[in-house]
A protein has these predicted regions:
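Short, conserved catalytic or interaction motifs in soluble domains
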Residues: 40
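DNA major-groove recognition helix of helix-turn-helix/homeodomain DNA-binding modules
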Residues: 48-58
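A short, Lys/Arg-rich alpha-helix, primarily the initiator
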Residues: 1-16
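Short alpha-helical DNA-recognition segment
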Residues: 18-37, 52
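Residue-level signal for the short linker/turn that defines the boundary of a DNA-recognition helix
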Residues: 8, 18-19, 45-48
């Protein structure tokens, strides 16, 4: 999965759940800028966040 796909999936899941980038950043303990970069494909989330994201978004 490429960066764009990861970002689109993350963005879509966040919108379905009805939360902001700021709210997700608080859950994960990262900056809002990090969430934005993940969603825009500029960066990947560290692999350690994937299990947390999976649990959070079910």
């Amino acid at each position: 999965m490429d960066r764009i796909a990861v970002g689109k999936v993350l963005h879509g899941l966040r919108k379905v759940k009805g939360i902001t980038q700021e709210q997700l950043s608080e859950v994960l303990g990262v900056s809002t800028a990090a969430i934005s970069k993940w969603e825009n494909g500029q960066m990947y989330p560290d692999i350690s966040y994937f299990p947390v994201l999976a649990r959070y978004f079910n």
